[in-house]
From Swiss-Prot:
Gene (name only): TRX1
Domain of life: Viruses
GO term, biological process aspect, one: viral capsid assembly
Protein's organism: Gallid herpesvirus 2 (strain Chicken/Md5/ATCC VR-987) (GaHV-2)
Chief location of this protein within or outside the cell: virion
Gene Ontology cellular component annotations, sorted alphabetically: host cell nucleus; viral capsid
Function: Structural component of the T=16 icosahedral capsid. The capsid is composed of pentamers and hexamers of major capsid protein/MCP, which are linked together by heterotrimers called triplexes. These triplexes are formed by a single molecule of triplex protein 1/TRX1 and two copies of triplex protein 2/TRX2. Additionally, TRX1 is required for efficient transport of TRX2 to the nucleus, which is the site of capsid assembly.
Molecular function in Gene Ontology: DNA binding
Pfam families according to UniProt: Herpes_VP19C
Protein's recorded name: Triplex capsid protein 1
């Protein structure tokens, strides 16, 4: 929330420039009293010394008279204190109570941004879910097929991508050609559907299979199990063709309300701000909290044993984990809670999935075309280059002429490890939690099934960009 506070602070001071100038004068007056003594301390008040005492009094009077919309509410009402700690407390209290209050009026703690989108309900059926479910948007399959044409490495067929999407289109309203590419399409996918499509890849088999059974029985579609299988095959084929799913799935937000009719729905989600700030229009659940299937939730800091505080401010991350062993690819999606920042979280992922990371570096090139033969330049011709330089130096050939005799090294990178073949995870920031938010595991009744879920109260949506891990 600090970047958000800074942005609104800048907005506030742009509206009231006199306040900023006044505060600058206060700190400039205080800064003039800094003495270059042995302890280098800040002398804010003195019992003696009219000049220094006058500077402090003038600074406090200027702070008291700062022109703000709520200047009359500033908490400098008692006589000026002559002690250093008293003057410091007065300044800090004034800055916190007045400036922070005006910034809060501009931001609004309960203000949030929502998005409404119309979609077909093939991959997201809101009637079977509860408010608070994480919703993702998916790009058009034609974009995925187009990227596969140039992203697929040598030795793998990019046309398989078009084939698996065509097979999925037999069960879902997925456009696979330019003729019927217009109109409403299944542009949203729920986190439950995404996890159920690859339920066999999760360590928590019971929770994943219970979620899959919930999607099959409650989504109200024919041949739902086969649709999940084919969607899961599409994810694996995307990974095999190096069209990574996270590049085509974007976070939309948390489900709030919806209007559905037959196979189409208008879905509203919170994309920025507190999840609980928007009403759900349901009497049974007027406010909603974000929830995640238990099989896909990880308390990151607890698992890697780096921070042991249960109550502290933290962030939520959406993480895609890839295993790229040819013929045994896996795609797992997790929601992880961590107190670490975005870049420190990346190092933690490398520690947690060190096995997956090393296996991808070794087996990520299986099934690719590797050049063979005597003409393959596997190593840099260092010896030949040194021999040419020594010979030219003995013969007295000029440096410009020696450039023509440099060794020509043309390496063939087909079948060599690249950052795409070594990619083991990708994540993006989902939002923030304060220290009072503690996730709770519960069993929720969905139709005739009990599904283990993790309720995460107090989520403040602040979606970031994708960061890839190699």
């Amino acid at each position: 929330m600090k970047p958000l506070l800074r942005s609104h602070e800048t907005q506030y001071y742009s509206l009231y420039p006199d306040t900023l100038n006044g505060l600058h004068n206060v700190f400039r007056t205080i800064g003039n009293s800094v003495q270059s003594d042995t302890v280098r301390r800040l002398n804010l008040g003195y019992l003696d010394g009219d000049n220094r005492r006058g500077n402090l009094a003038g600074g406090l009077e200027l702070l008291r008279d700062a022109t703000t919309p709520n200047a009359s509410r500033m908490n400098i009402t008692r006589p000026l204190d002559t002690s250093t700690s008293g003057a410091t407390a007065m300044i800090m209290q004034s800055l916190r109570t007045d400036v922070a209050e005006n910034i809060t009026l501009l931001t609004g703690d309960s203000r949030a941004t929502i998005s409404r989108q119309v979609t077909l309900t093939d991959f997201c059926f809101p009637d079977a879910e509860m408010p608070g479910l994480i919703i993702l948007s998916i790009r058009h399959p034609l974009d995925i097929n187009s990227e596969a044409l140039y992203a697929t490495p040598a030795g793998r067929d990019p046309r398989v991508m078009e084939t698996v999407w065509y097979e999925l289109s037999e069960l879902a309203a997925v456009s696979v050609n330019r003729v019927n590419g217009s109109g409403v399409r299944p542009s949203l996918v729920s986190l439950s559907f995404l996890i159920a499509a690859r339920a066999s890849d999760y360590a928590d088999k019971c929770g994943a299979e219970a979620l899959r059974a919930h999607v099959i029985s409650n989504y109200g579609r024919r041949r739902m199990e086969e649709k999940l299988d084919r969607f899961g095959i599409c994810l694996i084929t995307m990974l095999r063709c190096r069209v990574f799913p996270h590049r085509h799935f974007q976070l939309l937000g948390g489900l709030i309300s919806w209007i559905s009719q037959r196979e189409i729905a208008s879905i509203t989600a919170v994309v920025r701000g507190p999840q609980e700030s928007i009403k759900t229009e349901q009497t049974a659940m007027p406010r909603s909290s974000v929830y995640v299937p238990a099989c896909a939730y990880i308390d990151f800091d607890k698992d890697i044993r780096v921070i042991h505080e249960e109550r502290s401010s933290s962030s939520l991350y959406l993480v895609f984990v890839y295993t790229q062993k040819f013929g045994r690819e896996t795609v797992r999606i997790y929601v992880m809670r961590s107190r670490l920042g975005e870049w420190a979280f990346r190092e933690g992922l490398g520690y947690m999935y060190s096995g997956v990371r090393s296996n991808n570096a070794i087996t990520g090139v299986d099934g690719l075309i590797v050049p063979h033969g005597a003409n393959v330049n596997m190593e840099f011709p260092l010896t030949k280059t040194l021999d040419l330089r020594n010979r030219d130096r003995r013969l007295g050939i000029a440096a410009r002429s020696r450039d023509l005799n440099k060794a020509d090294w043309k390496v063939d990178l087909r079948g060599r490890p690249t950052k795409e073949s070594c990619m083991y995870a990708a994540y993006c920031r989902l939002g923030h939690l304060d220290e009072s938010s503690v996730p709770v595991k519960k069993f929720e009744r969905c139709g005739s099934l009990d599904i283990p879920v993790i309720w995460i109260p107090g989520v403040i949506w602040n979606i970031g960009t994708w960061i890839e891990c190699y």
